[in-house]
């Protein structure tokens, strides 16, 4: 049975999956291996190789059955997988600067390799989960985590952009002043913008802006007594799930910000689906429904023809990167007639 592999390289762990020509994932849940990325390219790439051997064994296939490998990493990087010369939070070792991680991995494995940044990989997985690998629909994904990632899928293909920065949705400016209850709020993003989506909808937004703002309105709240805003920010979602009024206000503002953003995307792309993923929605079903309802409440009135656009919650969020990377590799293998990976056979 011939397969493709998906490799999601994070800061501390590598997650793997494999998928066959019937679009069946052969690993359920996480299969992780230590990344050791802070020790530089040579050690990290060896870790990727070693972990892949374990993944194929778990899936019950051979390494020779893998016809292509999809890789995703945090950015910034070019569309072809050349990491930024300035490095990043996850690639602090000087050896990573300007490093061609996709090309080098392909040479080491002796197999073709594709590349996506982690946000685009997650978006491709969300698209596949709804439409399948070969359908030509358009979707917009917003992945709410420490920052705000995501991607744009048009006709089934990831929009990478000229320099690999396509789908940097977190830095789209939104008219946040129209969100009820935010008068006087000054959401500053780490990128230098004021009022982009990430500054209103992310864990960083909760820590830097939303929690301090709402603690001023709820001066006796238990989170204000912790004395550590970083620790307190991580507790907001759990309290919101349990109907804490202040924490629900915080998540309501985040949802309304997403509604404004999605409205812009509807007017720009007229997509078939909107998808939200990440830690904000890795919760119970009741809270997910409430959050989606608040997103819709934040969207201005749509044209009658567009008013029924679905808003989906991305499934299997912890494996989204590896699965999206694998789907990219599967598309590449099919387009280049590698192996026997048509939808009619494995």
Identify the function of each model-found stretch.
Residues 114-128, 282-346:
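Glycine-rich phosphate-binding/hydrolytic loop that grips phosphoryl groups
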Residues 4-8, 65-70, 139-143, 149, ...:
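Short glycine-aspartate micro-motif
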Residues 187, 193-273, 309:
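A mobile "lid/hinge" subdomain adjacent to the ATP/sugar-phosphate binding pocket shared
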Residues 13, 265, 269-298:
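Glycine-rich phosphate-binding loops at beta-strand->alpha-helix junctions
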Residues 131-200:
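Glycine-rich phosphate-binding loop of actin/hexokinase-like ATP-binding domains
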Residues 3-46, 50, 54, 84-88, ...:
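Short glycine-rich, Thr/Ser-proximal phosphate-binding strand/loop in the N-terminal lobe
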Residues 48-69, 113, 262-274:
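Phosphate/pyrophosphate-binding loops at sites that engage ATP/ADP/AMP, CoA/4′-phosphopantetheine
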Residues 41-49, 65-69, 75-138, 183, ...:
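Glycine-rich phosphate-binding loop and adjoining helix at the ATP-binding site
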């Amino acid at each position: 049975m011939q397969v493709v592999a998906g490799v999601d390289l994070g800061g501390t762990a590598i997650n793997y999956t494999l998928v066959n020509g019937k679009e069946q994932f052969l690993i359920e849940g996480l299969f992780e291996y230590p990344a050791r990325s802070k020790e530089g390219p040579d050690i990290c790439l060896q870790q990727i190789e070693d972990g892949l051997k374990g993944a194929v064994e778990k899936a019950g296939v051979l390494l020779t059955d893998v016809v292509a490998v999809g890789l995703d990493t945090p950015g910034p990087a070019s569309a072809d997988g050349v990491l930024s010369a300035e490095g990043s939070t996850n690639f602090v070792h000087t050896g990573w600067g300007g490093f061609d991680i996709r090309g080098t991995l392909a040479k080491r494995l002796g197999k073709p390799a594709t590349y996506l940044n982690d946000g685009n990989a997650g978006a491709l997985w969300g698209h596949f989960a709804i439409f399948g690998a070969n359908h030509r629909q358009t979707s917009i994904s917003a992945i709410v985590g420490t920052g705000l990632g995501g991607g744009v899928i048009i006709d089934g293909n990831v929009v990478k952009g000229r320099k690999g920065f396509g789908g940097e949705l977190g830095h789209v400016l939104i008219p946040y002043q129209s969100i009820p209850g935010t008068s006087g709020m000054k959401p500053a993003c780490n990128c230098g913008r004021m009022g982009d989506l990430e500054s209103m909808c992310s864990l960083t937004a909760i820590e830097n802006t939303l929690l301090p703002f709402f603690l001023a309105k709820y001066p006796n709240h238990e989170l204000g007594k912790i004395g550590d805003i970083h620790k307190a920010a991580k507790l907001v979602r759990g309290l919101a799930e349990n109907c804490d009024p202040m924490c629900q206000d915080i998540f309501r503002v985040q949802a309304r910000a997403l509604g404004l953003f999605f409205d812009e995307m509807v007017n720009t792309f007229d997509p078939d689906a909107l998808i939200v993923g990440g830690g904000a929605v890795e919760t119970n079903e009741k809270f997910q429904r409430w959050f989606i309802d608040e997103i819709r409440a934040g969207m201005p009135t749509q044209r009658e023809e567009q008013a029924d656009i679905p808003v989906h919650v991305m499934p299997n969020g912890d494996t989204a990167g590896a699965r999206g990377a694998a789907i990219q590799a599967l598309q590449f293998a099919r387009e280049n007639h590698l192996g026997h990976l048509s939808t009619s056979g494995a």
